[in-house]
Design a protein with these regions (language model features):
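Flexible, active-site-adjacent loop/turn segments at secondary-structure boundaries
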Residues: 40, 79-82, 86, 104-107, ...
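ATP-dependent carboxylate activation and anion-phosphoryl transfer catalytic cores
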Residues: 58, 108-207
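A long amphipathic alpha-helix within ATP-dependent nucleotide-binding catalytic cores
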Residues: 16-35, 85-144, 199
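Phosphate-binding site of ATP-dependent enzymes
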Residues: 10-98, 149-150
Length: 207
């Protein structure tokens, strides 16, 4: 929300214009609550993973099949990301990909097999760094010039669906070995384990 193609800036004047627009709000949404975040644009492939488990039991954390979000090759590098208008098909300020044909913004594929271990390990590290419990989706970018990976987000409230038109989890199910029901079962099991652990801790305190 609030993220558009014009947010990729190349000079101070462009930055000031974007900041001024954000402070004006968008459809009643206040984007300045809590401050604004500016970060380097990472040009390169984008990956996403889904994780279940708890940070305090890192050996039991499960990372499901990572997927690469491969953006339409008609787009220039600085447009290969999920802008709000294109993600939600609003097109108030931006044009759809392919204009008349409304081509897909991206497709999901398995990442290069040589990258999967690093993607999974970075996902676990990021999840534990924010004290993740239950589940989360991790978005990662790799700088195509250096090969270095960056965590874009750890989303603790990501959509849960096996429809990949709605969420990347559907693509993980299609490309991986796990069923969607397995993922939901792992989330429920972790929630029950966490609840039991807290109940035991409360019992010990009250003794």
């Amino acid at each position: 929300m609030g993220l558009g193609l014009k947010n990729v800036v190349n000079n101070d004047d462009e930055l000031k214009k974007v900041v001024d627009e954000l402070y004006c709000g968008y459809h009643g949404w206040d984007f300045t609550f809590g401050g604004l975040v500016a970060e380097k644009f990472v040009a390169g492939p984008e990956f996403t993973t889904f994780v279940t488990g708890s940070f305090d039991q890192p050996d039991d954390i499960k990372v499901y099949q990572p997927v690469e979000r491969v953006f339409n090759d008609k787009l220039p590098d600085h447009e290969k990301f999920l802008s709000f208008d294109r993600l939600w098909d609003t097109y108030e300020n931006e044009k759809p990909v392919g204009e008349k044909d409304y081509e897909n913004l991206w497709e999901y594929f398995k990442p290069d097999a040589t990258l999967e271990h690093a993607i999974k390990q970075l996902s676990i590290d990021a999840y534990c760094a924010v004290f993740g419990t239950g589940y989360g989706r991790i978005d990662i970018r790799m700088d195509k010039a250096t090969g270095k990976m960056y965590v874009l987000e750890v989303n603790a409230q990501c959509g849960l669906s096996e429809d990949e038109n709605y969420t990347s989890i559907g693509a993980m199910v299609r490309l991986g070995q796990d069923r969607f029901s397995d993922m939901l079962g792992a989330i429920i099991e972790n929630a029950l384990q966490t609840k039991l652990k807290r109940m035991k801790a409360a019992t010990l305190i009250n003794k």
